[in-house]
Structures are given as structure tokens and as C-alpha cells.
Amino acid sequence: MTNDTVHADAVVTEEDLRLLRDLKVKDRLHDLEVAYCRGIDRRDPELLKSIFFDDAFVRLGDMKEGGVDEWVDWIINEFKPRFENTTHYLLNEWYKVDVKTAEGETHRLSYHRFGDPARELIAASRTFNRYEERDGVWRIAFREVIRDWIHERPVDQELFTGGFAMELSKPGPEDKSYEVLSMFGRGPLPSE
């Protein structure tokens, strides 16, 4: 008999177990990436820090590079305050897993509203990430971001009234999601 596990009529092979483990890891990496989007848009420094290891390095082209604490402080206190609102969307995700390390390329579309009169900046970027599992926890160990394209235009204020009127999202703890979704509080991701 091999190392395969038999369940009734089914045989689970070592390859099946590896694929299942890789799927679980990829799901965890996806959670890190969507938590990044929420942390950026809700301006939640603890959530942002929790997706990275303490010794991780982040590089945003010529904008900023450095350790996680320095980067989070800059993004929350210097970069984001110039925008009334931001929304980040996670698009394509591609991960390669090798036991306790992984690499991933993720594509993002981001929206930034700012200024008087109001303008909107829409940009596409890609992130190149190295992930690691340490003590059973997956986090980002390295991230580099590059820009694919960027576009700026005036905001059509009429679209925020009449038949299109809805409550606008807010960048911090006043966002409606904290009122409606009790499981989505501020702060770090829970450990696995």
C-alpha cells in the first residue's frame, strides 16, 4: 500500500493533497490581497500592517520604498489624506506556490477622488509579491508595484444626485461597512 489515503471508493493521492494544500494557500493569498484593498480604502493602518511580515519591504517605484511601518505611516498620514475617497479593485491574480514560499502577480484598478473642483484619478497597476509562511501564518515578505496606465478627469457631480444618488463611501471608520457588517471591524487580520 502506498501513502495514499483510501475513503470508501475514493483514493486521495499525494498529488491530490498537494493540490488541495496549494488551493488553500492561494485562497489565503487572495485574502491578503483583498485585505490590502480594504485597508488602503478604509485607511486602516493595523489591517495594512497585518498583511505584511514586520521585516517586509515595499517598493512603489519613485513614490516610496522602505519597511512596512514606514510605508504604512507614509500611505496613511501623507499620501492618502490628499484624496477625499479611494477605491481599489483586485483584478487578475496569479500565484505560484512552493511549500512555504509563494510568488504572485496581481493586477489592480484604483480610483482616487480629490480637489476643488473635484477630479478623479483612475490608474491600473501590478504588484509583484513574495509571500512566506512563518509559524503557520502566510504574509507578504516583499512587494513591488508598477504602473500600467493612469488617467485624470473632472468629476461629473450630477452623477452623484438624482437617480444615481447613494450614500458615498468614506475613507475611515465612518464608512457604512462598519455599521452594516459586524464581522468586518477595523484592525489586523486574525491569525490563521
Language model segments and positions:
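Short, surface-exposed loop/helix-turn segments at secondary-structure junctions
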Residues: 117-121, 157-159
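A solvent-exposed, acidic/Ser-Thr-rich amphipathic alpha-helical stretch
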Residues: 45-114
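Acidic/histidine-enriched, glycine/proline-rich intrinsically disordered or flexible terminal extensions
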Residues: 153-192
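Short, low-complexity N-terminal intrinsically disordered segments enriched in polar/charged residues
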Residues: 1-38, 42, 46, 50
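Short beta-strand edge/turn micro-motifs at domain boundaries
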Residues: 2-6, 103, 126-159, 163-164
